[in-house]
Swiss-Prot record:
PROSITE patterns: RIBOSOMAL_S19. One of its GO terms (biological process) is ribosomal small subunit assembly. This is Small ribosomal subunit protein uS19. The keyword Magnesium does not apply. NCBIfam families: rpsS_bact. PANTHER family: RIBOSOMAL PROTEIN S19P FAMILY MEMBER, SMALL RIBOSOMAL SUBUNIT PROTEIN US19M. Pfam families: Ribosomal_S19.
Length: 92
């Protein structure tokens, strides 16, 4: 279930301030954030935001198709390396 339209989209205040400051300064440097739950707004298009995945910051370039999604959707937190293979010639 989505968020109520009456409330509007959630975005961290500090992140929104950084994006708006870069828009006024015409600066496109990487913005680091831990706010995975922030919604991507049209103001963010063209920016690169480094989203924390629990270990490192993953750079995410914002495009038009990402509007309305959350930042955390583009920075996976789990790594899957496949199931362990059986050793060759192992007896069961």
């Amino acid at each position: 279930m989505g968020r109520s339209l009456k409330k509007g989209p959630f975005i961290a205040d500090s992140l929104l301030k950084k994006v708006e400051k870069q828009n006024t300064d015409n600066d496109k440097s990487v913005i680091k954030t831990w706010s995975r739950s922030s919604t991507i707004l049209p103001v963010m298009i063209g920016h690169t935001i480094a989203v924390h995945n629990g270990k490192t910051h993953i750079p995410v370039f914002i495009t038009e198709q990402m509007i309305g999604h959350k930042l955390g959707e583009f920075a996976p937190t789990r790594t899957y390396r496949g199931h362990i293979r059986d050793k060759k010639g192992a007896k069961s």
